[in-house]
Swiss-Prot record:
The chain crosses the membrane at residues 3-23, 45-65, 88-108, 115-135, 150-170, 191-211, 225-245, 255-275. It catalyses: di-trans,octa-cis-undecaprenyl diphosphate + H2O = di-trans,octa-cis-undecaprenyl phosphate + phosphate + H(+). GO terms for molecular function: undecaprenyl-diphosphatase activity. Keywords: Antibiotic resistance, Cell inner membrane, Cell membrane, Cell shape, Cell wall biogenesis/degradation, Hydrolase, Membrane, Peptidoglycan synthesis, Transmembrane, Transmembrane helix. This is Undecaprenyl-diphosphatase. The gene is uppP. It is an enzyme of class 3 (hydrolase). Bacitracin is thought to be involved in the inhibition of peptidoglycan synthesis by sequestering undecaprenyl diphosphate, thereby reducing the pool of lipid carrier available. It comes from Psychrobacter cryohalolentis (strain ATCC BAA-1226 / DSM 17306 / VKM B-2378 / K5). The keyword Protein biosynthesis does not apply. It is a multi-pass membrane protein.
Length: 280
């Protein structure tokens, strides 16, 4: 049993749990962390990075179970306690999910082959940071105070913006939260709609990648490493979800814009100056 490998799995789970719902690209930080620690082989890191997100999204399901159940019942029966428009949230999430499912399933291999390099990641980190500054500094007219108020048109726009997250370094949370803010959704509703939208997307991607590449797990230790990372990401994400919701009700996202830009510049320096190539 490699204790160092298990410790690295814990660290990777912590990184995932912290970064998954922040607008900073959790995948980018996971791969950078794996490279810095010399964590696992390339094939196993590729699988780990996708599957460990399952733990983080389980935290959303756990924390919002009552609300998600009401949304599901509203969608199926047209009745949900405390919802004036019971079907709205469920329909909006379906509409917002369709674009990324189509684009993701169609171009996933091409994106991984041609866009998964440090230059693309760095550029998208920097562009994303600049866009956060732009959205945060423009006047906002709120059209949706709660996630249940997001219209189908707005949901479709958020779903189209989520497709940008297929480009490495963009951040699914960044594209959806900042995109929702730009479209006039309140801060709290933007964060929560992004949380909910991640459920079908992340679960679908994790299951698909696991089914396709589970043969890279060749020992019980491999399964243990993946399991530890997933459990740790669940625990840390559960804490971070609550902190983020509290944060967005009082502050903006500019600190994350700076973090994206600084990280992007450092990755560019590493790539151009030292020939750095991402393991993923």
């Amino acid at each position: 049993m490699d204790i160092i490998l298990l410790i690295q799995a814990v660290i990777m789970g912590i990184v995932e749990g912290i970064t998954e719902f922040l607008p900073i690209s959790s995948t980018g930080y996971l791969i950078l962390s794996a490279d810095l620690m010399g964590f696992w082989t390339k094939e196993k890191v590729d699988l780990f990075v996708v599957v460990v997100q399952f733990g983080a999204i389980l935290a959303v399901i756990y924390d919002y179970w009552g609300r998600l159940w009401q949304a599901l019942m509203g969608l199926l029966t047209g009745k949900a306690e405390g919802m004036s428009n019971p079907r709205q949230l469920g329909l909006s999430l379906i509409v917002a999910t369709i674009p990324v499912m189509i684009v993701g399933f169609t171009f996933a291999d091409e994106i991984k082959a041609y866009l998964f390099n440090p230059i693309v990641v760095a550029i998208m980190l920097i562009i994303g940071g600049l866009l956060i500054f732009y959205v945060e500094n423009r006047p906002k007219a709120i059209i949706a105070e709660e996630a249940e108020d997001v219209s189908l048109k707005t949901a479709l726009m958020i779903g189209l913006l989520q497709c940008l997250a297929l480009i490495p370094g963009t951040s699914r949370s960044g594209a959806t939260i900042i995109g929702a803010l730009w479209l006039g959704v309140s801060r709290k509703a933007s964060a929560e709609f992004s949380f909910f939208l991640g459920i079908p997307v992340i679960i679908g991607a994790a299951l698909l990648d696991f089914i396709k590449h589970r043969d890279v797990l060749t020992s019980s230790e491999d399964w243990l490493v993946l399991g530890i990372g997933t459990v740790v990401s669940f625990i840390i994400a559960l804490l971070c979800i609550r902190l983020l919701v509290a944060w967005v009700s009082r502050r903006d996202f500019k600190i994350f814009a700076w973090l994206r830009i600084i990280t992007g510049v450092l990755v560019l320096i590493a790539a151009w100056g030292f020939g750095y190539q991402m393991a993923g």
